[in-house]
Amino acid sequence: WELVKNLKKGKAVFSQPPMPIKCAGAPQKAMYLSCDHWFKEGVLNDINVEFYNTGAVLFGVKEYVPALMEYVKKYNAALNFEHQLVKVDGKAKVASFKNVANPEAPLVETEFDMLHAVPPQSPPDFIKVSPLVDSDGWIDVDQSTLQHKAFANIFALGDAINAPNAKTAA
């Protein structure tokens, strides 16, 4: 929040890592809330806002996209899809993004005055090393019953299971 409040001009870069993350909308919420603050402070016109999303679309639920695009337009945010943050040089203030649609393409490097980076997320280590997980490290449950696929006396729920839902409490 201090970075947002203190930024009066320059470039603000926001990134969204590949799924799963606990809340697919959180990286965008950070951008919209920051932009709204800058808009109300009268400095948004002096800030270049860029959003880099590893995914190919703004949001996975297409019915929400038109409303979100209104905010993107209001805040004049540049959208960059299929770009994953892979490196940050904090001293030089440069963020590097891989084009996931074309992995052979050179990295896209962009300077920033403020960077909001959401780290990739995974299950806790104590879960990943247990015998309860699938090949990706998530607790392996039947998505309809939440019963473990190998251990009938185990049920699991929450953001450590391999169900395809967003890992969020929202």
Go through the PLM ranges and name each one.
Residues 1-8, 111-170:
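FAD-site-proximal beta/loop scaffold in flavoenzymes
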Residues 17, 54-56, 159:
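Cofactor-binding loop segments of dinucleotide-utilizing enzymes, especially the Rossmann-like FAD-
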Residues 27-31, 65, 170:
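Amphipathic alpha-helical segments in well-structured domains
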Residues 11, 46-49, 153:
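Residues at the starts of beta-strands that form the adenosine-phosphate
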Residues 1-43, 143-144:
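Glycine-rich dinucleotide-binding loop and its adjacent helix/turn
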Residues 22-26, 60, 164-165:
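Secondary-structure boundary/capping motif
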Residues 39-141:
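A Rossmann-like FAD-binding core segment of flavoenzymes
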